[in-house]
Amino acid sequence: IVVGSFGKTFHVTGWKTGYCMAAPELMKMFRQVYQFASFCAVTPVQMALATFMQQHPEHIEELAGFYQQKRDLFNSGLKNSRFQFTPSQGTYFQNLDYSAIRPDLNDVAMCTFLAEQHGIVAIPISVFYQQAPENLRLIRFCFAKKDETLQQASAILSAV
C-alpha cells in the first residue's frame, strides 16, 4: 500500500489532496472506508492536479534535484552550527541532533525552547515512536520552503 500527498510534490500544501495505491482488492476496501471518512473531495483541485501532471510530466523527474538543492542550501547554512546531522536522502526533511547544545532537554522541550526563544519551529522525532528512546535528541525540519526561509532558519539555528 502506498499513501501519499500531492502537497509538497506539486508545491500546493494547502490543497490537502493525496492518493492511495494498492492491489485492487485492497483499493475496494479503501474506497469503502474513504466514503465514510471524508465528506467530499475538492474536485477542482483534483482536476487541476491531473491537468498539471499531464502537461508537465518532467516535474516529477526534476523533483529530486529540486529538493536536493533545498537540502544542500539548508545544510550548508548549518555547517558552522553545533547541530550534528547526516544529509537526508529521499525526503524533504532533515533531522538534527542537538545533543551538543541542550542535552538536558528532551525533543519536545527542545522544540518548545526553539519556538519560544528563537521563533523557529521543529518537529520532535519522538512523535513518530510508540515509545521513544530516552536519550533521543533529534528534531526534524522540513526544507520544502522558500530559499529565503531556509537561509533565515539556518542562520537562527547556527546562533543557538
Report each predicted region and the residues it spans.
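PLP-dependent class I/II
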Residues: 1-160
